[in-house]
Design a protein with these regions (language model features):
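Bacterial Sec-dependent N-terminal signal peptides
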Residues: 1-26
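Interaction-mediating elements
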Residues: 21-160
Length: 160
């Protein structure tokens, strides 16, 4: 029994390493000062802040918990910043779930968040086909799908 639990834990850890390669965790002290200052101005009461950096160092993101317990993130680039408001699965908009189910029947929604860039709000959906068995699950054919706030489909991008 111990061997099975150890094997399951190793498999889960290896999957975490595989999926975490696109963004790298960084210390706040390694983030450009202007991004930290902007973050502190925008999210004064943020809790559990974790910073990540994109693989090519072009973007930094602070993921945090708001005072009311919601998961949020602010992503900074040289050109702009965007705020992400993550939505719990139980609150996914029905129209978006229906569109994804009809246009991508083999895909499962893995994440939905509202993206705010300079006051323009959109829903961002990440959907993937899952393959594997039991604990050994792998995402395939990942799609980033954008919707207007009225749930109208804007675009679909295949994730690399």
């Amino acid at each position: 029994m111990k061997k099975i639990l150890l094997l399951a834990a190793l498999i889960l850890m290896s999957q975490t390493v595989v999926f975490a390669q696109k963004e790298k965790s960084v210390k706040e002290s390694d983030v450009p000062v202007r991004y930290v200052r902007d973050f502190n101005n925008q999210a004064k009461d943020a809790q559990n802040v974790a910073w990540t950096m994109s693989e090519d160092s072009s973007a930094y993101m602070a993921t945090f918990t708001s005072p009311d317990g919601d998961k949020q993130a602010i992503r900074f680039t040289n050109k702009t910043s965007e705020t992400r408001y993550y939505i719990d699965e139980q609150y996914y908009p029905h129209a978006i779930k229906d569109t994804v189910a009809s246009q991508f029947p083999k895909h499962k929604i893995t994440e939905i968040y509202i993206r705010n860039i300079k006051g323009k709000m959109t829903y961002q959906v990440r959907a993937a086909r899952m393959s594997g068995f039991l604990f050994w699950k792998k995402e395939k054919d990942v799609k980033q799908i954008s919707f207007e706030t009225n749930s109208k489909l804007i675009e679909v991008i295949d994730e690399q």
